[in-house]
Swiss-Prot record:
A motif ('HIGH' region) lies at residues 40-51. This is Leucine--tRNA ligase. It comes from Chlorobium phaeovibrioides (strain DSM 265 / 1930) (Prosthecochloris vibrioformis (strain DSM 265)). A motif ('KMSKS' region) lies at residues 576-580. Keywords: Aminoacyl-tRNA synthetase, ATP-binding, Cytoplasm, Ligase, Nucleotide-binding, Protein biosynthesis. Gene3D superfamilies: 3.10.20.590, HUPs (3.40.50.620), Isoleucyl-tRNA Synthetase, Domain 1 (1.10.730.10), Valyl/Leucyl/Isoleucyl-tRNA synthetase, editing domain (3.90.740.10).
Length: 805
C-alpha cells in the first residue's frame, strides 16, 4: 500500500475533531504546560510557509508534553482589530467586519490542514463583543487607577494612513516609505512609566533570549544622574539640565535645549528671535527618529542667551537643537564636546570651545574621547577638585557638592515614555468614556460599548475619528445630563495585551478570567513568536499584566516565563518573502503538493529553530522520501500487505540503538532542537531498514518518537498495528540509561594541545586507567620521553592532554 498523505491527513483531522482529542480542561492531579503562539492578525494575503514555522514548533512542544503526562493548554485565536485589518478592508472596499471573518476562515482552514493540536473550543477573536468588553473593562481599571489620562501631545502622524503611530512603530512605517510628521492631538495616554522599575527588574527572572531582554532594558533606558541648575543671565531664573556625567561639568562649554522647551522662544534675544522661530517651525515637521539619528547632520540655532556654569562661573551659550527631546530628562543638556561624540560634532560645526576634563590618549581638538576608564583633569575650583579621580569617585563628589550648593540633585531618569494609546480610526475597541459639558469624564456603565454600524469608516484628514461624524452614537443623555462619547479607539495592541488570559477561561461572562483557573494555568510556560515584538507587544503585555497583578486579577508577576524567537524562513532567493519580490510561497500550495507532515518536518529540519534560513523545494522532497521509508516499515509492498513484525525483543545492537535514539530525541525535543531530533530519527529509520529485523517494538518506538512531528502518518501506522487509542494520547517511550550509553568511547590523546593518538575505553573508566593507557600509546610515548609532565588534564570519556616542559 502506498502512502496517500491527502487521504490520511483528512481522515485524522476529522477524527481528532470528532473525538475532541485536544480539548483541555483543568486537571489538578496533573502537571500543567501552557504553550502559546503569538496569535496572528488575519490579513487578506493568507499564510505563507514562513508563518507556519513558529506554529509547527509550538505544536511539536504541545504534543510532546502531552505524551509526557502534562495537561497541555495549546489555544489559538485572532488579533483582528486595528490598522492592518482596516487597511485591507479599505483597499478591497468591504467592511472590516466582513473581511475579518473571511480572513479568519481562511487562516483557520490552513492551520487545521497542518494538523495543529489546538483546543478550538477556546478560540477567541479580539473583535468579539464578549472579548473586547473585558479589554474595555481593563481600560476603565487603568483610568480608575490614574494610569490612563488625556493629554494634548505632539504625536507621530502618518499622512498616508491618517493615523497616529506609537514611537515604537515609526521606524517600520518610515522603512515602508510612508510619511510621518509631528502634530498636536488630543490623546489618551497610558502611564507605563509608573511601572518602569518593575518592568526592568523582573526581566532578570525570565527565560527569554538575552537580546530581547536587552532591547527592553535599552527601551526602558534607566539612567542615574544629576539635575544641574544653570543660572540664566538677564532672566532671573534657572535652566535645569539632566546629565549622567556630572564629573565632566568643568568641561561643559555650551547648553542645548529642545525646540519644544518651554523657554525656547523666551531665551531668544531680539536679534535671534526670527532665526529661533524658523528653526522651531522646521523641527516640528521632523519625526523623533529623524531628529535623533546618529548619522544625521547636526543643526542648531543660538538663542543669544547665556547661562552660568556653577563649577567654573563661566557664561555658556544656550543653543537650540532638534537632537534634544523634551520627553527625556528636562529637555535641556549640558554639552561636553571633548567627551561626547554628538557634542563634539556640534561644537566643530559651530566653532564652540572644546575642553579636556578626562585624560585622553590623543588631542581632543582632533578627535573625541568618550572613555570612562581614565581619570579627571582640569577640574577644580576653590571649593572642589576632581583631578586624579576615576569616574565613580568623581561622580559622587560632584553630585554631593552640587547638592550641598543647592545647584543640583541626584535623579533617576528613563528613556521610556508613556504609551500614546488612542487612535483616530473606526476599527478598534471603543474607549468607554463619556465627556460632559463641565469637563468631567465618566465611564460607560454598560459594557461592551459597541461600534456603530456604519458605511463610511475611512479615516478623516482632520485627525478626528470617523466616529465623530455619527451623531446618533456620539451624543447621549443620562442621569448626569448630556454627554459626548469618546471618539478615539484603542490601538491594535490593546487586545493582545491580555489574550493569553482569556484562553484560560474564554466563555466567562462574569470575569475576564476565573481566579482558580488562572492560578492553575499561569504563567505561560512556552511562548513562541518573532523578536520584532520585543518593545511593542511584549512590553505592553508585561505592563498590563503587572496592573492586573496589582488588581489581584492574576497571581503571577509576569505573563510569559519562557520566550523563544523563531528565525525567519526566507524565499528561495535568500530574501525576505514579500509580494513585491514575488518570492512568497503560499502555505496552501505546499500543503496540497507535499502534505502537512512533510511541511512540518521540513520546516523543523531546515536548521536550528532560532536561525534564519532559506526555503528549498528540493529539501522538502527529501523529507517526503523519508516519510515513505517510515511507511514501508509497516507497509513494505505496494499491493497492500502489512509487514509481519516480530514480537521478539530486538537484537542487542538494535536495542541499544533504539534506547540511544529515545534519549536523543527526548532531549532535543525538550530543548527545541528539532532539526537534530529529526536527524536522529532518520538514522534510526535507516538502521531498521538495514537490519531487516522487523521488530514491532522498534517500529512502534519510532512511531511514538515521530508522532509529535508527523502526527498523521504516525496515527495511521499506529492504527494499522492494531492500536485502538490515538497515538496522540500514548505515552512517550522511556529509555534505559544503561542501554542508551555507548559501549565504548574514543579518547583523544594530546601532548601540549596537539593530537598524538587515540584509544577506546569503556564509558566512565577510572582516571588512572585512562592515563596509563594513554602513556602506553606508541605515538604518545616518544613525546613524553625526556620531558617533565607539568599537568595531566582528563576530560571524562573524551580527551586527555599532557602539558609537558
Amino acid at each position: 500500500m502506498r502512502y496517500d498523505f491527502s487521504k490520511t491527513e483528512k481522515k485524522w483531522q476529522a477524527r481528532w475533531k470528532q473525538q475532541e482529542t485536544f480539548k483541555t480542561g483543568e486537571a489538578p492531579e496533573k502537571p500543567k504546560y501552557y504553550v502559546l503562539d503569538m496569535f496572528p492578525y488575519p490579513s487578506g494575503s493568507g499564510l505563507h510557509v514562513g508563518h507556519l514555522e513558529g506554529y509547527t514548533a509550538s505544536d511539536i512542544s504541545a504534543r510532546y508534553r502531552r505524551s509526557r503526562g502534562y495537561n497541555v493548554l495549546h489555544p489559538m485565536g485572532w488579533d483582528a482589530f486595528g490598522l492592518p485589518a482596516e487597511q485591507f478592508a479599505i483597499k478591497t472596499g468591504t467592511h472590516p467586519s466582513d473581511t475579518t471573518q473571511k480572513n479568519i476562515a481562511n487562516f483557520k482552514e490552513t492551520l487545521q490542514a497542518m494538523g495543529f493540536s489546538y483546543d478550538w473550543s477556546r478560540e477567541i477573536n479580539t473583535t468579539d463583543p464578549g472579548y473586547f468588553q473585558w479589554t474595555q473593562w481593563i481600560f476603565l481599571k487603568l483610568h480608575e487607577m490614574g494610569l490612563a489620562y488625556m493629554s494634548e501631545v505632539d504625536v507621530n502622524w502618518c499622512v498616508e494612513l491618517r493615523a497616529v503611530l506609537a514611537n515604537e512603530e515609526v521606524e517600520e512605517k518610515l522603512a515602508d516609505g510612508l510619511t510621518v510628521v509631528r502634530r498636536p492631538l488630543r490623546q489618551w495616554v497610558l502611564k507605563i512609566t509608573a511601572y518602569a522599575d518593575r518592568l526592568l527588574e523582573d526581566l532578570d527572572g525570565l527565560d527569554w533570549p538575552e537580546n530581547v531582554k536587552q532591547m527592553q532594558r535599552n527601551w526602558i533606558g534607566r539612567s542615574e544622574g544629576v539635575e544641574v541648575d544653570f543660572e540664566l543671565r538677564c532672566h532671573r531664573t534657572m535652566l535645569r539640565v539632566y546629565t549622567t556625567r556630572p564629573d565632566t561639568l568643568f568641561g561643559a562649554t555650551y547648553l542645548v535645549i529642545s525646540p519644544e522647551h518651554a523657554m525656547a522662544e523666551k531665551l531668544a534675544t531680539a536679534q535671534q528671535l526670527v532665526a529661533v522661530k524658523e528653526y522651531i517651525a522646521k523641527a516640528k515637521l521632523k519625526t523623533e527618529l529623524e531628529r535623533t539619528g546618529l548619522q544625521k547632520d547636526k543643526t542648531g540655532v543660538f538663542t543669544g542667551s547665556y547661562a552660568i556654569n556653577p563649577a567654573t562661573g563661566e557664561p555658556l551659550p544656550v543653543w537650540i537643537s532638534d537632537f534634544v527631546l523634551t520627553s527625556y530628562g528636562t529637555g535641556a543638556i549640558m554639552s561636553v564636546p571633548a567627551h561626547d561624540s554628538r557634542d563634539w560634532e556640534f561644537a566643530k560645526q559651530y566653532g564652540l570651545p572644546i575642553i579636556e576634563v578626562v585624560k585622553s590618549p590623543h588631542d581632543v581638538q582632533q578627535e573625541v574621547f568618550e572613555g570612562k576608564d581614565s581619570t579627571v583633569v582640569n577640574s577644580s575650583n576653590n571649593d572642589i577638585s576632581l583631578n586624579g579621580l576615576a569616574f565613580p569617585e568623581a561622580f559622587e563628589l560632584m553630585a554631593s557638592w552640587l547638592e550641598k550648593k543647592k545647584a543640583g540633585k541626584r535623579k533617576v531618569n528613563y528613556r521610556l515614555r508613556d504609551w500614546i494609546f488612542s487612535r483616530q480610526r473606526y476599527w478598534g475597541e471603543p474607549i468607554p468614556i463619556k465627556h460632559y459639558p463641565d469637563g468631567t469624564l465618566k465611564p460607560e456603565t454598560s459594557l461592551p460599548l459597541m461600534l456603530p454600524e456604519v458605511e463610511a469608516y475611512q479615516p478623516t484628514e482632520t485627525g478626528e475619528s470617523p466616529l465623530a461624524n455619527i451623531p446618533e452614537w456620539l451624543n447621549g443623555t443620562d442621569e448626569n445630563g448630556p454627554f459626548r462619547r469618546e471618539t478615539n479607539t484603542m490601538p491594535q495592541w490593546a487586545g493582545s495585551c491580555w489574550y493569553y488570559l482569556r484562553f484560560i477561561d474564554p466563555h466567562n461572562s462574569k470575569l475576564p478570567v476565573d481566579p482558580a483557573k488562572e492560578a492553575y494555568w499561569m504563567n505561560v510556560d512556552l511562548y513562541i513568536g518573532g523578536a520584532e515584538h520585543a518593545v511593542l507587544h511584549l512590553l505592553y503585555a508585561r505592563f498590563w499584566h503587572k496592573v492586573l497583578f496589582d488588581l489581584k486579577v492574576v497571581s503571577t508577576k509576569e505573563p510569559f516565563q519562557r520566550l523563544f524567537n523563531q528565525g525567519m524562513i526566507l524565499g528561495e532567493d535568500n530574501e525576505k518573502m514579500s509580494k513585491s519580490r514575488g518570492n512568497v510561497i503560499p502555505a496552501d500550495h505546499v500543503l496540497q503538493t507535499y502534505g502537512a507532515d512533510a511541511v512540518r518536518l521540513y520546516e523543523m529540519f531546515l536548521g536550528p529553530l532560532e536561525q534564519v534560513k532559506p526555503w528549498n523545494t528540493n529539501g522538502i522532497e527529501g523529507i517526503s522520501r523519508f516519510l515513505s521509508r517510515v511507511w514501508r516499515l509497516v507497509w513494505p509492498e505496494p499491493e497492500g500487505t502489512r509487514a509481519d513484525l516480530s514480537t521478539l525483543a530486538p537484537s542487542p545492537d538494535l536495542l541499544r540503538r533504539m534506547h540511544k535514539t529515545i534519549k536523543k530525541v527526548a532531549a532535543d525535543t525538550e530543548n527545541l532542537k528539532f532539526n537534530t531530533a529529526i536527524a536522529e530519527m532518520m538514522v534510526f529509520t535507516n538502521e531498521l531498514h538495514r537490519t531487516g529485523e522487523g521488530s514491532r517494538i522498534a517500529v512502534e518506538t519510532l512511531l511514538l518518537l515521530l508522532a509529535p512531528y508527523a502526527p498523521h502518518l504516525s496515527e495511521e501506522l499506529w492504527e494499522a498495528l492494531g492500536h485502538q487509542e490515538s497515538i496522540s494520547l500514548a505515552p512517550f517511550p522511556e529509555f534505559d540509561p544503561e542501554l542508551a550509553q555507548d559501549k565504548e568511547v574514543t579518547i583523544a590523546v594530546q601532548v601540549n594541545g596537539k593530537l598524538r593518538g587515540s584509544f577506546t575505553a569503556a564509558p566512565g573508566s577510572p582516571k588512572e586507567q585512562l592515563l596509563n593507557e594513554a602513556k602506553a600509546l606508541e605515538g604518545v610515548k616518544k613525546f613524553l620521553e625526556g620531558v617533565t609532565i607539568m599537568k595531566e588534564i582528563v576530560v571524562p570519556d573524551k580527551l586527555i592532554n599532557f602539558a609537558v616542559k
